[in-house]
């Protein structure tokens, strides 16, 4: 079985209501930080970045409850490679693949999983029927967050400062 097939089966398993509800209940005991007091996104730890186990495995795991789309914010990258598992809800995502340089619209529903590299840009532009709850598994930080603008890729601090923050 190849890696993507394994992750596909794992994603479907994690989205079973009893499994997803257990993960959510465990994660909600450990708040990481919320963006806009949770109006945009709630974030919780399952495997805290920097912990002994996280350093040993080379990953950290958070639960994200996405309560709002990215609005008019530009497409953005992340400073690490990550994999997301959709547990509940869902969304439409715009993706820019660095290798190909074109946009793709993708619907994400419970059971779906995908990986993003640090150079891939994305934007969540529509939620499906309420919040989307995801398991967010990421590796070591290798770069900064960037937002894609007509002036090129802008570091997130600069972009957020000039565009009203999150």
Located regions from the model:
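Beta-sandwich/jelly-roll carbohydrate-recognition scaffolds of carbohydrate-active enzymes
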Residues: 53-59, 81-82, 94, 109, ...
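Short histidine-centered beta-strand/loop micro-motifs
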Residues: 53-55, 71-78, 106, 125-127
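Conserved short histidine dyad/triad with adjacent acidic residue
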Residues: 62-77, 118
């Amino acid at each position: 079985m190849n890696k993507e097939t394994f992750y596909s089966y794992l994603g479907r398993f994690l989205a079973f209501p009893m499994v997803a509800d257990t993960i959510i209940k465990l994660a909600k005991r450990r708040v990481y930080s919320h963006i806009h007091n949770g109006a945009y996104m709630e974030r919780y730890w399952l495997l805290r970045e920097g912990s002994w186990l996280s350093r040993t495995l080379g990953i950290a795991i958070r639960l994200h409850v996405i309560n709002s789309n990215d609005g008019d914010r530009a497409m953005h990258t992340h400073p690490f490679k990550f994999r997301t598992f959709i547990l509940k809800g869902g969304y439409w995502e715009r993706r820019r693949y660095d290798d190909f340089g074109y946009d793709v619209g993708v619907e994400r529903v419970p059971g779906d999983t995908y990986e993003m590299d640090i150079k891939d840009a994305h934007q969540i532009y529509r939620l499906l029927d309420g919040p989307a709850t995801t398991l967010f598994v990421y590796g070591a930080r290798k770069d900064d967050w960037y937002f894609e603008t007509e002036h090129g890729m802008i570091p997130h601090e600069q972009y957020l400062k000039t565009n009203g923050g999150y």
